[in-house]
């Protein structure tokens, strides 16, 4: 499901029916529109789940499905459209459906919004929507998978872009400052690529120079972010994983659907610090704010802290 975002004054919420709503922090509605009314009916196989991302005063939506391939920028103050661009792709069948979320990043003078789906990871100019670069061959034509819909989202950290694909296929890591044009395997700016081993649903985690890929079955693949060298692979809990891992204070937290929370020490070697369990089911990713951990279960919302 889509995750809310906030600038500290307003909270922005997106629903599976396409409602995009802004509230003030007291819960008063400021503006609203429906993305299906504005941009056409959704045609997703499994519903609309993409988060609307807030970046430098604007909201960015990716609407990637069988009836539309759009990226949209909206003014966060008014809800009015700033720009809309068509996101070109040659993907077919189920690949046309993206359940991933865009991400946005500023690195010095470089600002970028990254959309993900329909076989490509694409960087856009936030001011205009113009395509700056695209990571290609995530679903190679010589062994094309017509069901390779993207669910895991790209991440940006320490100047690296991590672009996952799906279903244990490939992942690409690109240096953001060098990204340019069409980036195939070994292309401009690409640091490394592996042809298999990506996550399917959970998003990658890049933390302190190490890339963590949490598989759906509770296996973590740990790689050197600069070189792609495998550091370790361990199955730490045999359960279903939907929520993405998070990092804090030198630790990595993994959330299993059965309510088991596994804590690993961050670093290049495997070290299990502990496990805890709550009597609930979890498919959402944890959120961390002001020394508190927030967990959204099927039954309850939990806040966990030292006080």
What do the predicted segments below correspond to?
Residues 1-307:
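Noncatalytic, solvent-exposed loop/strand surfaces
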């Amino acid at each position: 499901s889509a995750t809310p975002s906030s600038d500290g004054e307003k909270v922005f919420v997106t629903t599976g029916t396409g409602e995009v709503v802004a509230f003030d922090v007291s819960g008063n509605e400021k503006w609203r529109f429906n993305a299906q009314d504005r941009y056409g009916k959704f045609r997703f196989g499994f519903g609309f789940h993409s988060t609307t991302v807030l970046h430098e005063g604007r909201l960015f939506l990716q609407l990637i499905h069988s009836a539309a391939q759009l990226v949209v920028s909206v003014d966060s103050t008014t809800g009015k459209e700033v720009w809309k661009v068509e996101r070109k792709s040659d993907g077919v069948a189920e690949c046309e459906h993206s359940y991933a979320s865009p991400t946005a990043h500023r690195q010095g003078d470089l600002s970028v919004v990254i959309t993900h789906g329909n076989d490509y990871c694409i960087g856009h100019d936030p001011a205009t929507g113009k395509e700056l670069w695209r990571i290609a061959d995530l679903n190679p034509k010589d062994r094309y998978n017509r069901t390779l819909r993207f669910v895991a989202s790209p991440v940006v950290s320490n100047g690296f872009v991590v672009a996952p694909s799906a279903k244990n296929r490939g992942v690409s890591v690109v240096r953001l400052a060098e990204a340019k044009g069409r980036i195939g395997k070994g292309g401009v700016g690409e640091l490394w690529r592996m042809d298999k081993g990506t996550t399917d649903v959970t998003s990658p985690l890049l933390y302190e120079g190490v890339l963590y890929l949490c598989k759906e079955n509770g296996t973590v693949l740990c790689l050197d972010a600069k070189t792609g060298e495998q550091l370790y692979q361990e199955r730490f809990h045999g359960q279903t994983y939907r929520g993405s891992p998070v990092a804090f204070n030198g630790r990595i937290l993994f959330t299993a659907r059965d309510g088991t929370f596994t804590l690993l020490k961050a670093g290049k070697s495997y070290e299990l610090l502990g496990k805890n369990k709550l009597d609930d089911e979890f498919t959402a990713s944890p959120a961390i704010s002001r020394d508190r951990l927030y967990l959204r279960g099927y039954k309850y919302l939990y806040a966990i802290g030292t006080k």
